[in-house]
A protein has these predicted regions:
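Beta-sheet-rich non-transmembrane sensory/scaffold domains
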Residues: 1-169
Length: 169
């Protein structure tokens, strides 16, 4: 999740995603209703308040990463240092240290059981995997700069905005 690691580096990190879908649709299959979410994510940023904080800046803001949970190198720019996260979550035991890192979006789409709220499917890193394989020069690129390879990796990656649900006959 760095836009300064000089490449396509899809990996698992100890980060939780705030799904925050921009689009939700419903469908019914075999009498059961499901919700589909496009998990974009979005920071709250208003006059007088912004929750957005890069991982490397937690310590400067007075809430360092818990050294019992995270190796200090995780805050390096080539690791998670540039990842934009929320400053409002993560101190689980109220000791002033961040125990969990929460980033915006899940970079995927998910299917949820509408009755129980349980997640029944998540596409995982497929958007990034497919782009890396088919259009590597556009991997996590922005939509407003022609030469922006990897420019969105520290934000929300492929940033799924919308979805449609249909029937195949």
């Amino acid at each position: 999740p760095s836009n300064r690691d000089d490449g396509i580096n899809i990996a698992s990190w100890p980060v939780k995603g705030l799904y925050q879908p921009d689009s939700i649709a419903a469908y019914t299959r075999h009498g059961r209703t499901y919700l589909v979410s496009a998990n974009e994510g979005d920071a709250r940023d208003y006059d007088g308040f912004s929750e957005e904080l890069r991982v490397k800046d937690f310590e400067d803001e007075g809430t360092p990463l818990d050294p019992d949970v995270f190796d200090p190198s995780i805050a390096d720019d080539q690791n998670l240092g540039r990842l934009k996260t929320t400053s409002t979550l993560g101190d689980l035991d109220n000791d002033g240290l961040i125990d969990e890192i929460y980033a915006y979006g899940a970079r995927s789409f998910s299917i949820w059981d509408a009755r129980t709220g349980a997640q029944v499917f998540d596409r995982g890193s497929d958007f990034e995997d497919i782009t890396a394989n088919l259009l590597p020069a556009q991997f996590n690129a922005t939509n407003d700069d022609n030469d922006s390879f990897d420019g969105r990796s520290d934000d929300k990656g492929p940033e799924p905005e919308g979805l449609d649900v249909g029937n195949l006959l």
